[in-house]
Amino acid sequence: MRLLKSNSLLRLVNSYLVDSPQPGNLSYMWNFGSLLAVCLVIQILTGCFLAMHYTAHVDLAFNSVEHIMRDVNNGWLIRYTHANVASFFFIFVYCHIARGLYYGSFKEPRTLTWSIGVIILILMMAIAFLGYVLPFGQMSLWGATVITNLMSAIPVYGQDIVELIWGGFSVSNATLNRFFSLHYILPFLLAALAVAHMIALHVHGSGNPNGLNAGDDRFPMHPYFIFKDLVTIFAFLLVLSIFVCFYPNALGHSDNYIPANPMVTPASIVPEWYLLPFYAILRSIPNKLLGVIAMFGSLLILLVLPLTDLSRVRGNQFRPLMKLSFWFFVVDFIILMWIGAEHPASPYLEVGQIATAFYFAWFVFIVPAVGLFENTMADINKL
């Protein structure tokens, strides 16, 4: 312990992971940060090992993945761990964001922490999309074609941008090389942003379920919260091992086990399940450009939440009306996820349009309206 406080580098680690004061009433909802850190470490390690055996070539990529599965010692374990942890990564991120929305973690003085978190989410989605293309199965090829073609909606320069991304006039060897290079390097940028996220959080410390200033009611990170984090980490590793060993493809898509064929279009082109809500928003708007704007806007709108939440009370713990609207929002997000996996035909198209309208209305109208109503009622009760 003396070394932790005397060494300049270890002293920094000590201030973040050992002696960091945390509110005494933190629930298990505050454990997602440590779970996400574990996921990021697993993804970087397994990704590095996979890159040692992967070949970024349109004629060899699919076979190199099969080589990893069949010939590399424990290659199946590395690949299935990488694929399934990606899904758990997004499960934990969505839960982490939901906790932030519910407990008002986006409000001052933690707005910077929230903003960095939103940037991390967007970067995660980009990395996930790049990785989905690398096995170069049917869904990889056609998913890359459809998603990159969205850039063609940009006026004047759209098609030029698409061809710049492709490195040619279609998804080709140059595209696969670019995607592999970016998929390898961007997780390290993600790790840097995660450190920045933690530094920003460390300035004012964690919030708590009551939304109040914890004051002196704090305990050191170690051993109390470290062991609390270990409970959920071991639970996660247990569930992950069940998926990897018994249901490795439960969260994937069967069409990606068919080699990419530009002459045959799959019956349904869908991204991975964790991108489906935003894919549903994209498809719910008939105009291509407006659909692309709405899809990116559905992520960027999280940045304006600190401005639109006008309530004087932090979080929804003591706000029954806002608590109800929050659960409506969660249901709406699940509906969008369901719609994103369906064909864009009636009645799914109409349901998707209603769900998309509610998604944006929640941020722009419902959150500020409920906040103003609660503030007004509080002022009336004071009279």
From Swiss-Prot:
Record-listed heme b b566 binding positions: H96, H197
Subcellular location: Mitochondrion inner membrane
Note describing how the cofactor binds: Binds 2 heme b groups non-covalently.
Keyword list, A-Z: Electron transport, Heme, Iron, Membrane, Metal-binding, Mitochondrion, Mitochondrion inner membrane, Respiratory chain, Transmembrane, Transmembrane helix, Transport, Ubiquinone
Binding site for heme b b562: H82, H183
Binding residues annotated for a ubiquinone, in chain numbering: H202
Bilayer-spanning residue ranges: 32-52, 76-98, 113-133, 179-199, 225-245, 289-309, 321-341, 348-368
Entry GO MF terms: metal ion binding; ubiquinol-cytochrome-c reductase activity
Primary location group: mitochondrion
Listed cofactors: heme b
Gene Ontology CC: one annotated term: mitochondrial inner membrane
InterPro entries according to UniProt: Cyt_b/b6_C (IPR005798), Cyt_b/b6_C_sf (IPR036150), Cyt_b/b6_N (IPR005797), Cytb/b6-like_sf (IPR027387), Cytochrome_b (IPR030689), Cytochrome_b_C_euk/bac (IPR048260), Cytochrome_b_N_euk/bac (IPR048259), Di-haem_cyt_TM (IPR016174)
Superkingdom of source: Eukaryota
Protein family membership: Belongs to the cytochrome b family.
PANTHER family: CYTOCHROME B
Record function comment: Component of the ubiquinol-cytochrome c reductase complex (complex III or cytochrome b-c1 complex) that is part of the mitochondrial respiratory chain. The b-c1 complex mediates electron transfer from ubiquinol to cytochrome c. Contributes to the generation of a proton gradient across the mitochondrial membrane that is then used for ATP synthesis.
Record text on subunit structure and interactions: Fungal cytochrome b-c1 complex contains 10 subunits; 3 respiratory subunits, 2 core proteins and 5 low-molecular weight proteins. Cytochrome b-c1 complex is a homodimer.
Misc. remarks from the entry: Heme 1 (or BL or b562) is low-potential and absorbs at about 562 nm, and heme 2 (or BH or b566) is high-potential and absorbs at about 566 nm.
Stated name of the protein: Cytochrome b
